[in-house]
Amino acid sequence: MGALKRMAPAISRRKLVYLSVVGALAATATLVVPTAADARITKVTITTKESPTFGGYSWPGVGQYEKILGTAYGELDPNDPHNAVIVDIKLAPRNAAGKVEYSHNFYLLKPIDLAKGNHKVVYDAVNRGSKTFSVLNRGLNGDDPGSVTDAQTLANTFLFPKGYSYAASGWDASAGTDPANFNLIINLPVAKNLDGTTITGPAYEYIVTSGASAGLTYAAATLNKSQAKLTHRVHLDDVPQVVPDAGWDYNADGTSIHLVGSNFVNNDIYEFSYVAKNPTVNGIGFAAVRDFMEWIRYEAEDDFKLANPMAGDVNRIYTITRSQPARMLNDFRTLGFNASEGNRKVFDAIFNWVGAADGINMNYRFSNPGTTQRNRQDQLYPEAFFPFANESTTDHISGMTAGRYDKCTATITCPLGMEVYSSNEYWVKAASLFHTDTQGTADLPGHPLARLYLISSHQHSNPGNVNSKGSCQQFGNPLASEPVQRALWEAMDKWSTQGIEPPPSMVPRLADGTLVPPLPQSAAGFPNIPGVTYTGLKSTRYRFNYGPNFYATGIMTTYPPVVSSPMFDNLANGPIYPSLVPKTDVDGNEIAGIRLPDVRVPIRTYSGWSLRSGVWANDGCEGSGQSVAFPATKANRVASGDPRLSVEERYPTFLDYYFKVAKAINDMVAERFMLPEDAGAAMNRMLNAGFATGAIKMEPEDVDE
């Protein structure tokens, strides 16, 4: 296995070109002077300081860490152009200085001796209040990572041995208002009409629960049921059946609904439309992230002389995300929030996991950032709108020209972007729009400050269980992206600090035939596997009609939008942005993207999509993928009629399998998609998976004595 120690090839000369660009941007950015009108953190309170944390564990060369918990209080100038994009900010209450106030809690981990750290901060843009950095950090997880004391876990972790500081803070209204159990929350103002009266408007809930009641994001403005409607259906494409008024009711304060005499049926689809009141100004969450990171990076103290615990130390801030916060940071860039009111850069690089081309249901009146569209759920919430790509494109529907990097380009505050995502995003979130024009007819060249990486055949987020089907038709997809993420993180850091470019984008393309429609099945490449249903089910990205002024104001007057069955590929539901999916090889594994060792030396078919089972059969199984084992032997294959070669036909001996796995891992290290330190664990995992097939067996002669 000595070959696993090979180093990556020399870096491309293109880094010299990028260095000149970086130098120019940096030189220009240092000339910007913040104005007196800057939005800012005015007050910070520290509620907990644990020094040392991690049970006193000390990393060689870095030392011990401390944990700091507290609350940050901020204010925004509603008239500043940087904040004017926040929907309803001019209708939020103001203090005596004419500013809009908010607060959020935070969680910091930092070296006690900052001089021993690497002067870089990892900002965890939390998912619905919970921390996400476990996807990168090798087993160190939970919402209070500082409480971990196991020496082996801490020694093996990824970020802290390198001296990173860590920060997380609340930004998401859907995380609630309870900070218990280290939940990170934000307290937001409620918008009022200019005359001080209560704002009301249409609101919508998609309900999938087995409970007796379903909470509402916003309280009902009236308990008069004639101004509300509850519907029920089993399949996405069933005609919704109206639940009679006598069949449901509000609770006393209009904050939840319940069925009369029964519970909601788990996994059935209920939709509730009603008139709501008191919208929170959720778009302030963008500014809260911006201003807290600006304070951490640039300020010495708050207005009350409380010292910034990171003062004078921060040279770089990178983000880490998973899913929902990645979508938030997509809109964060689009709306220009990487520049403070004084045009100071906030993030040097954004590392997004499973965000792809999507946005977030946040900067709209009566929005709910906790929702997420997939291939069955939450289809009608406002989530993903043009622009989808980082570079500027023209929307063939609206005629607008824009890109996610346009605003930061104008202020010279663009972050580097590492966009890492799964196959699932193509099937349920139209990820192809990240790198095609809006008509799906031409590949985009890619923005020079961003890279796009598909993890081939991967499901959304965490690995699935190969021994469980859950609510899906097939067993879970076990592919794990974490080693690739760590390698790309290192590449991102070198890009930011040294100008060494990361590997080129790895996505399916129209030009090479690896980006295709899901139907017909033969053109998509997916084989006819016995017992596996393939329907080509893929979500459709529409430009929905939320009312005449929605796309200019963020205020919905038609909510939910009017749609009809079928849900997908139906022009009656609105203009369509065509999207495509990755083509597969003869085994059903995707051709383009970063192919993990499991895909390069397969024993299964791995898919980023899956279908539901039971009474909901053939509806989408949301973020779940699937895996279908190859036949173990040729006899099994012939008997079942499976077109895929069996395991024994592919790998006639243990050593054949062993050396193919070793080559796959070596290649990933050479390509900079795996760190040498992760190679051994990958080898062991692959060997164990091979043994589990029963067709790969180590013989006595395979043992090196």
Residue ranges and their predicted role:
Residues A27-A36:
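C-terminal segment of classical bacterial N-terminal signal peptides
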Residues L16-V17, V289:
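N-terminal export leaders
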